UniProtKB/Swiss-Prot annotation:
The chain crosses the membrane at residues 8-28, 36-56, 87-107, 132-152, 162-182, 199-219, 237-257, 282-302, 320-340, 352-372, 374-394. GO terms for cellular component: plasma membrane. Belongs to the polysaccharide synthase family. HI_0867/HI_1700 subfamily. InterPro entries: Polysacc_synth, PolySynth_Transporter. This is Lsg locus putative protein 1. It is a multi-pass membrane protein.
Length: 401
């Protein structure tokens, strides 16, 4: 009953927090236009890339530390991770300053505070503080919307840059208050240099093997935008990116359920109540759910989307449907990969990701030389390819336990 209650809280929190940006789409689509939205999508690609580098999946390291070693020295790992993010982030900021790119500077700074905030969310997830987690998420999106509207209404030029700046301000404000509350609830303790060194090695040991894994996610989620930006037009990218953004609603629901279930999933594995054969059955049955969102969207007339987004976005529905298919393929993926995460098989996860990414990139390159309407199929091919690989890897790991 507890897992169901938390799942509902996480789901409602995630959906309500993302509802504001979703409602903001008609405003952004009209304010930026299809070309401006395409340009925004391009620069958000760099924000995602910077986040991978400065974060080094600290939220995952925090979660695993909590369940394996307890909460006694959790603050040591949190602060050490923050120090790493600050140093690496500063190097990226210097690079942006040398390149004299103000918009990339904002993107880099935003990635730093987003990494800080992700750690705070991970701590609350580990502590099963579902309400606190949901409140932070909702606060982040509300402040993001307020800053976005304020900046885009006040300024008339460089609106894409102002949208990135709004994201930065939102991350900064919400992280400041969430960290303030975290510090109030945490007992201060002095640690020696060797303790910080051990914590850093733990973070690096957890995160570095996963660099390829998350780099693979970046390539699958962002590389297509770079290809389209340079191969086709900003208008084409705007339609494509809008379809992907709309499909994000389903992804949010899936991720919310996953985050709510993970603590109980790990506990079941720890107590030997869950075996790999059950996970394989769940992954297989989940394929029945994959076509449902796309079929629902196929029935809805495109006029509805055009009415919401504006007349410039005719053609978005086609991309929306295809992205829904590739998005829902994450359900069997998460079922299988969480098993490997629990047992710390990060190298295996990276190997799986690299193999599927190679397949995806090869498909993307080939499809780029056709027409833009075929490019979303690269995502479907890449998402499908990793599932049999994970099936084999989870079976292999279960035999060694």
């Amino acid at each position: 009953m507890k897992v169901f209650k938390d799942s509902v809280i996480y789901l409602v929190g995630e959906l309500s927090s993302k509802l504001v940006p979703f409602l903001l789409l008609p405003y952004l689509s009209r304010k930026l236009g299809v070309e401006g939205y395409g340009s925004l999508s391009y620069y958000q690609t760099f924000l995602s890339l910077f986040l991978i580098v400065v974060s080094l999946t600290q939220e995952g390291a925090i979660s695993r530390y909590f369940y394996f070693y307890g909460k006694r020295s959790l603050n040591l790992v949190v602060n050490t991770g923050y120090a790493y993010t600050t140093i690496i982030g500063s190097i990226i900021l210097i690079g942006c300053w040398i390149a004299q790119s103000e918009i990339l500077f904002y993107a880099a700074l935003s990635s730093i505070f987003q990494s800080f905030l992700n750690v705070q969310l991970s701590v609350r997830q580990c502590q099963k503080k579902a309400w606190s987690y949901a409140f932070i998420q909702f606060s982040l999106t509300v402040t993001g919307a307020v800053f976005t509207v304020a900046l885009l209404e006040y300024y008339q030029n460089d609106l894409v840059e102002k949208r990135i700046l709004a994201i930065l301000l939102s991350n900064l404000v919400v992280w400041f208050f969430s960290y303030f509350l975290y510090r109030k609830s945490t007992t201060s303790k002095k640690y020696q240099f060797k303790h910080y060194q051990s914590a850093l090695f733990y973070i690096l040991g957890f995160g570095l093997p996963l660099i390829l894994h998350y780099a693979s996610f970046f390539l699958k989620g962002q590389l297509d935008r770079i290809f389209i930006y340079h191969k086709f037009s900003e208008t084409d990218l705007g339609l494509y990116a809008m379809g992907a953004q709309l499909a994000l609603v389903v992804s949010i629901a899936i991720q919310a359920l996953n985050k709510a279930i993970i603590p109980y999933f790990y506990e079941a594995l720890k107590q030997k109540k869950l075996v790999v054969q059950q996970l394989h059955k769940w992954a297989l049955f989940s394929f029945l759910l994959i076509p449902i969102p796309a079929l629902i969207m196929w029935i809805i007339p495109e006029d509805v989307l055009v009415w919401i987004l504006g007349s410039q976005f005719v053609g978005t529905k086609y991309y929306f449907i295809l992205f829904l298919i590739s998005t829902t393929l994450s359900i069997p993926y998460l079922i299988l990969v969480n098993y490997l995460f629990y047992y710390g098989k990060n190298k295996l996860i990276s190997q799986c990701s690299v193999l599927s990414t190679i397949i995806y990139v090869a498909s993307l390159v080939a499809l780029t030389f056709t027409e833009i309407k075929y490019i979303p199929y690269a995502g479907i091919i890449g998402s499908l390819s990793i599932i049999p690989i994970l099936y084999f890897m989870t079976s292999k790991v279960s035999k060694t336990l």
